[in-house]
A protein has these predicted regions:
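Short, flexible active-site loop motifs that bind/organize anionic cofactors or intermediates
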Residues: 3, 25-27, 138
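Glycine- and acidic-residue-enriched helix-capping/strand-helix junction motifs
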Residues: 1-9
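N-terminal active-site beta-alpha-beta segment that forms phosphate/nucleotide-binding
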Residues: 9, 13-90, 95-99
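Conserved phosphate- and dinucleotide-binding cores of soluble alpha/beta proteins
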Residues: 94-212
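N-terminal start-of-chain detector that recognizes signal peptides
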Residues: 1-2, 21-24, 71-74, 85-87, ...
Length: 212
């Protein structure tokens, strides 16, 4: 990464951490993926029950692999091919001690935006697991919450759609078609503007480009 980009991310990271803390989130800034992995593992006591959704950024940091290798009870839907077992795992995550997720976007004033297909990820952010850990690269940070919603819909969702390959317009065009398909991955949009109870949601911001 160029030094100018690193310096830019570092400066914005410092501002964002302060703004997240004003909104009662726990927040940490890590310059590298290696630092971020260490920080995430420091937040999760051994013996905890840990689950996650489709957390690409966390996977790029190495969180899921480290949790599998550690002394934790793991809830991982990707271990199953049977849809019923996958659904069971998704529901089981509501009782996890820690749920690991990413963010589709963040506003520099400390608000998080997520867009979801099934609703399990946004549902758990709102209510369920005792602790939420959000791993997010600084490429996700936008000037305003309006820009963050726009990013979630027009960048994050179409890019995620390329992973899933579902028969939605953005699969073919790369552009949001504002579809209402049964296969849409954009059925719920969640703005998390404050944390209650304080500290339940913990951000580990990474000074690199991660996820979509």
């Amino acid at each position: 990464m160029e030094q100018a980009t690193r310096s830019y991310f570092d400066k914005r990271g410092e501002i964002l951490v302060k703004n997240l803390q004003k909104r009662h989130f726990e927040a940490y800034y890590c310059a590298t993926k290696e630092e971020a992995l260490k920080q995430v593992l420091e937040l999760i006591p051994e013996g905890s029950t840990v689950g996650w959704g489709g957390a690409v950024s966390a996977a790029q940091v190495g969180v899921q692999a480290a949790v599998h290798a550690g002394n934790y009870t793991v809830i991982d839907r990707d271990q199953f091919s049977d849809p019923a077992e996958k659904l069971r795992c998704m529901r089981e995550c509501f009782n996890a001690d820690y749920f690991i997720t990413g963010a589709n976007s963040l506003s520099i004033d400390g608000q998080m935006v997520n867009i979801d297909g099934n609703g399990n990820r946004v549902g758990m952010i709102v209510y369920g697991p005792k602790n939420i850990i959000v791993v997010a690269g600084m490429n996700k940070v936008c000037p305003s919450v309006e820009d963050a919603v726009k990013r979630a819909r027009t960048i994050a969702a179409p890019m995620n759609q390329q992973r899933f390959g579902l028969p939605n317009p953005c699969s073919c065009t790369g552009v949001c078609g504002n579809c209402l398909n049964e296969t849409s991955i954009c059925n719920q949009i969640l703005i998390t503007r404050n944390c209650k109870p304080a500290g339940r949601i913990k951000f580990v911001l990474v000074g690199e480009e991660l996820g979509f």
